[in-house]
Amino acid sequence: MTTLTAQQIACVYAWLAQLFSRELDDEQLTQIASAQMAEWFSLLKNEPPLTAAVNELENRIATLTVRDDARLELAADFCGLFLMTDKQAALPYASAYKQDEQEIKRLLVEAGMETSGNFNEPADHLAIYLELLSHLHFSLGEGTVPARRIDSLRQKTLTALWQWLPEFVARCRQYDSFGFYAALSQLLLVLVECDHQNR
């Protein structure tokens, strides 16, 4: 990635963490279809690797705006994909993909972070990885901690996430019949891949 700043990448990770952590409420549903989000998506589409994924997400959002009971239907999709058994779901936990669930805890300690008591999910939840990446990108932009140290931790986090993210995304694509979370996860996959290559 060349044109997005560290803060912009941090914002994308934070936004994705929020969308993967809980069902969308009415306010979030309105926000994702807003003119402000359209501007944000335009900025992301300036990065060629992200263009197709952002276009697909925008298509899903456009379809969502005409879907009857959109919030309830999307909540059902969220529940079916992320909260049920793993037989026909895409569980958002590293441990569901036979990865070391302690790795994220070690990374959080190294970053001087801990999980919030308000987030009632295990530490190996996808949203925790994304919050950590957001924090690290914000830290890169601030320049208060040596960039080499932050970048090393960012690479470790990206490597740990990449161990299971492709399978998670494949399952989202397989089991999300409406396609909003499939498109969202595809955008995440491309973002992480670009971030990982940007050493």
Curated annotation (Swiss-Prot):
Its main location: cytoplasm. It is found in: Cytoplasm. GO terms for cellular component: cytoplasm. It holds the Pfam family Nitrate_red_del. Transmembrane segments: none annotated. Keywords: Chaperone, Cytoplasm. It comes from the Bacteria. One of its GO terms (biological process) is protein folding. NCBIfam families: PRK04976.1. Belongs to the TorD/DmsD family. TorD subfamily. Involved in the biogenesis of TorA. Acts on TorA before the insertion of the molybdenum cofactor and, as a result, probably favors a conformation of the apoenzyme that is competent for acquiring the cofactor. This is Chaperone protein TorD. The gene is torD.
